[in-house]
Regions:
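Active-site-adjacent betaalpha module
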Residues: 1-21, 60-65, 82-83, 90-219
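Acidic-leg catalytic submotif of subtilisin-like serine proteases
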Residues: 21-31
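Active-site loop signature of alpha/beta-hydrolase-fold enzymes
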Residues: 30, 77, 183
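Short acidic/His/Gly/Ser-rich catalytic and metal-binding motifs that mark active-site loops
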Residues: 30-35, 80-81
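Short glycine-enriched, charge-decorated loop/helix-capping segments at active-site entrances
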Residues: 37-47
Length: 219
């Protein structure tokens, strides 16, 4: 059991490591570096880099408890074959046309070196805000009998929250770890976290990393 709001997680008190995964969303060079997509779009990546120690600590305790760690990476094919006209237009509008930003063939696509990725971790590549759209994430989760998801990563208001909403609609039990998520927009970050708890937890529950680690230690 993990102390959380508006209810302790999971709601029925049965937290089973083999049925639980820690999702680490998009902690890539393109989002966290000073020269990547996020910075070139006018956002400060400092808040995103700041969560790395917390995420690393969570991953360490999750693995020790027998919980699967799953990373996601956002990016497109090098030949842009999977990029829609609208996405190409947005890319051009942002001044990124002709660059390798957010392309899978670029260094920026890689997970940051300060992230403690382990060989047993699973990596899911995506092109959309949701890690479920056009990926094999749900198949991986169902194949492993995973029913409970712990959310971390960036950005809170876009890829984390979109994946969270889709997970809830797919009947996964979800917990968002507030201090293990980050955004370049403080208002959007706070709003996204607040939305988790409205209507008695319409998008699951919200906790901090210390509460999660304490709950895992008690298993």
């Amino acid at each position: 059991m993990i102390a959380a709001q508006p209810f302790n997680f999971p709601y029925d008190g049965r937290l089973v490591p083999a049925s639980t995964a820690l999702l680490v969303i998009d902690l890539q060079e393109d989002f966290l570096s000073n020269t990547g997509y996020f910075a070139r779009s006018g956002y400060d990546p400092t808040p995103l880099r700041a969560i790395l120690p917390t995420v690393n600590r969570l991953m360490k305790h999750a693995r020790a408890a027998g919980i699967q760690v799953i990373h996601t990476r956002q990016g497109y094919r090098g030949d842009l074959a999977d990029m829609t006209p609208y996405e190409k237009w947005r890319r051009q509008r942002a001044g990124l046309d002709g660059t390798d930003v957010l392309l899978r063939s670029s260094p920026g696509f890689q997970l940051v070196s300060d992230l403690d990725v382990s060989p047993e971790d699973i990596i899911v590549d995506k092109t959309c805000n949701s890690a479920f759209t056009y990926t094999d994430l749900e198949h991986i989760l169902r194949a492993r009998g995973i029913t409970h998801l712990l959310f971390s990563g960036c950005t809170t208001d876009v890829c984390v929250h979109t994946t969270l909403r889709e997970a809830c609609d797919r009947n996964f039990q979800c917990l968002t770890i507030a201090d293990a998520c980050a955004s370049g927009d403080a208002y959007a970050h706070a709003a996204a976290l607040h939305m988790v708890t409205v209507e008695n937890g319409i998008f699951g529950a919200l906790a901090d990393a210390d509460a999660v680690i304490a709950g895992l230690a008690a298993l």
